[in-house]
Amino acid sequence: MTSPAAFPGGACFAFTIMDDTDNATVENVQPIYRLLESLGMRTTKTVWPVRCEEGSEMFGAGETLDDPGYRDFVVDLGRRGFEIAFHGATMESSHRERTMRGLNRFTEMFGPPRVHANHSFNRENLYWGVDRIDDPILRAAYRAALGHPDDFYQGHVPGSAFWWGDLCAGQIKYVRNLTFDEINLRRVNPSMPYSDDRRPYVPWWFSASDAENVDAFVELISVGNQSRLEAEGGVCIVATHLGKGFCVNGAVRDDVRELLVRLAERRGWFVPVGPMLDELRVRRTDRALPPGEWRRMQWRWARDLMLRRLATLRRARKRKGAQNQRRVGSQM
């Protein structure tokens, strides 16, 4: 377990953001980072160190460290106290050689990465797909939902073309796994960060609060949730994509700005993921995750994932209905 003592500086809760770099460009994320800096918040930004030579249908709009303007922007973020983290070598699956090239590029610019998050369906993802979890019922359900063979993700499989588990174990300290629709992660994973002997190539795992895009982020950090996070002395690491709608026409969306300003006025500890997990780790009395906690986490993650998928379908139907109404109206 992790001690619930107050945080450094007398803060009574901890909050940060882990920004997955999908779709990120200088244009669509710079304003939100300037806002975070002005509020005294320092967060974590993941990057892709090298370009994707084969192109990417889903993520091709995102920039990498091979883009000079983006590279300069990210280097400047690091100088300003933001943490730069690894999101794989690039936006599509990478064999070991490209992953090594990406890690070397990252290390040359920022030093070895301390924090990593798997990306989408990249085959070099570590302990991904059904290997994220152990519960046999949930593994069977997730297998059916994904439609991937069990050995699709091979970053942790020695001898695979996608193998890089040894590199992770030697360089990276923290890797993200399960995410939840919960602002206070102490409610679902009080033993974070934790080690898992069944997944030995990751030194420490951590959980996150899920906010896929700007609308989910606004819902997650509502004023009511902020008040609860503060009252409970909670920990929040938001897994999100700051390139997905946070900035419009060069400005941070009004509701995002208002909520972040209100959050910054509270007695929070606003540091990047790595330093936050370092502080939580030294409070651990052991490295392991209690079996009961892990069992509850898996089922809560599965429930939250299903509810998010249903909510996405409802929003899509609502948008389609609105489009149909406009189409009918224009024909009258």
Give, region by region, the residue ranges found by the protein language model:
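Short, glycine-/Ser/Thr-/acidic-enriched flexible segments
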Residues: G243
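C-terminal active-site rim and adjoining tail of enzyme catalytic domains
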Residues: D210
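Catalytic alpha-helical scaffold of carbohydrate-active enzymes acting on polysaccharides/glycoconjugates
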Residues: M1-V202, A216-V238, F246-M332
